A protein has these predicted regions:
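EAL-family c-di-GMP phosphodiesterase catalytic domain
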Residues: 184-185, 236-243, 262-277, 289-398
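Active-site core of bacterial EAL-family cyclic-dinucleotide phosphodiesterase domains
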Residues: 140-197, 234, 295, 352, ...
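C-di-GMP signaling machinery
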Residues: 106, 110, 115-158, 168, ...
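Catalytic strand-loop-helix junctions within cyclic-nucleotide turnover domains
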Residues: 58-67, 85-88, 92-109, 133-136, ...
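Catalytic core of bacterial c-di-GMP phosphodiesterases, primarily the EAL and HD-GYP domains
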Residues: 103, 167-176, 201-279, 354
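Conserved helix-loop-beta segment at the catalytic/binding core of cyclic-nucleotide signaling proteins
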Residues: 33-64, 291-295, 348, 358
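Conserved long alpha-helical elements within nucleotide-processing catalytic cores of c-di-GMP signaling
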Residues: 1-5, 11-37, 48-52, 56, ...
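A short glycine-enriched loop-to-beta-strand structural element that forms part of the catalytic core
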Residues: 4, 49-58, 77, 83-118, ...
Length: 398
């Protein structure tokens, strides 16, 4: 017999622990496991637990159609809402499936199933089967991870800067640093490909340190030219758990004789939620240095309003998904206008990213938005272009 290994990631598990606590998470897993075991107690199916948020199945049988039907049954079973402490917990699950001729190399087959499951999760697909195409993609990723080490060691990384315009003074007061990778053979590697890879390894710490140091070096160079620009840079969830991060930032500021106002740090809501307690501790330590911290991509996370009270952010960046259709969407206008008013009352400065036309910019100015960012103001540009853009001191000359 052939075997099919099915690995399921229970994405909603993190929401359970955030809302109801760790004990509720265990209760949720227990109920879900019992439901599955009762429903799929068959001679050809073994059900067990994988990693913390995973359930695994070993199914004997050749027929692909039969396996597809079974997977759909499992999906329907797991998608049913679970009620805990009177709260309905919606289910979100991702399936990875691998085929095995035998279980003699079970570990490698589970690795294949996990690769498929991770792809399903990343691409927001419900079910992914491991095949030759996915195998090749995995090989490419492995090579990129190897090359990433060389990129850091051999100066293949560089920064572009996207200007951020004060909508009050109409002056460029800050920029966002965006890391890029110029591979010697493959050309420019998109950040949405190599950053997620780096975040899965310790390389993200090396990249973040490189960016912090380079930003401090650049800020010092601009100061000598009379440009007093704050540089915003992004931190990942792994960075927030780095107990040497804050000391490194402080050392870089001191080395380049910069004040804390030279840097600003941006953290996505989802990154902060990976380890809420650790994130809050790190953010408070960063703020103690005098550096402002922004919540990035606001409006796309889970239970956003409660997080504004929990996390000690200074700045709120409204996600571009609300801004790009601002002119044509009355709903987006209502959300953005009320968010600006509410968050100003809470003491936040507001940044709108994704501004692509004059009408959206004017609406944001009318509503009192503090800072704007987007291609209408400027695309990401080099440090030399920033000098010209900023010294021109009026939007449209960049």
């Amino acid at each position: 017999d052939r075997y099919h290994l099915i690995l399921v990631n229970i994405e909603s598990l993190s929401d359970v622990s955030h809302v109801l606590g760790m004990s509720a998470e265990k209760d949720y897993l227990c109920r879900l496991s019992n439901r599955i075991k009762e429903r799929f107690s068959r001679p050809n199916i073994l059900v067990g637990r994988g990693h913390e948020s995973e359930i695994c199945f070993i199914v004997s049988g050749d027929e692909m159609a039969g396996i597809s039907t079974l997977v759909n049954e499992i999906q329907r079973c797991m998608d049913k809402t679970v009620i805990l402490s009177g709260v309905e917990i919606p289910s979100e699950n991702y399936f990875g499936i691998a085929c095995a001729e035998s279980l003699s190399e079970e570990d490698s087959h589970w690795q294949s199933a996990r690769s498929a499951m991770n792809m399903a999760k990343e691409e927001r697909l419900k079910i992914v089967w491991f095949d030759e195409k996915l195998k090749q993609a995995g090989i490419v990723r492995s090579l990129l991870i190897t090359d990433l080490k060389d990129a850091i060691e051999h100066d293949q990384l560089y920064l572009l800067y996207q200007p951020k315009l004060s909508l009050i003074s109409n002056r460029v007061t800050s920029v966002e640093a965006l890391v890029r990778w110029r591979h010697p053979e493959k050309g420019i590697i998109p950040p949405d490909l190599f950053i997620p890879l780096a975040e899965k390894t310790a390389f993200i710490h090396d990249i973040t340190r490189w960016v912090i140091n380079y930003c401090c070096k650049q800020a010092a160079a601009w100061k000598l030219m009379g440009l007093d620009l704050t540089i915003a840079l992004n931190l990942s969830s792994r960075d927030l758990s780095d107990d040497r991060l804050v000391d490194y930032i402080q050392a870089c500021l001191a080395e380049h004789e910069l004040s804390a106002s030279s840097l600003q740090l941006e953290i996505t809501e989802s990154a902060a939620l990976q380890d809420e307690k650790q994130s809050i501790e790190t953010i408070l330590a960063i703020k103690k240095l005098g550096i402002e911290v922004a919540i990035d991509d606001y409006g796309t996370g889970y239970s956003s309003l409660s997080h504004l009270r929990t996390f000690p952010f200074d700045i709120l960046k409204i996600d571009r998904s609300f801004i790009t259709d601002l002119v044509d969407s009355k709903m987006n206008q209502a959300v953005v206008k009320s968010t600006i008013a509410m968050c100003h009352d809470m003491g936040f400065s507001i940044v709108a990213e994704g501004i692509e036309d004059a009408k959206a910019l004017n609406l944001l100015k009318q509503w009192g938005c503090d800072v704007g960012q987007g291609y209408f103001i400027s695309r990401p540009i080099s440090s030399e272009e920033i000098q010209v853009f900023s010294l021109a001191n009026t939007m449209g000359k960049g």
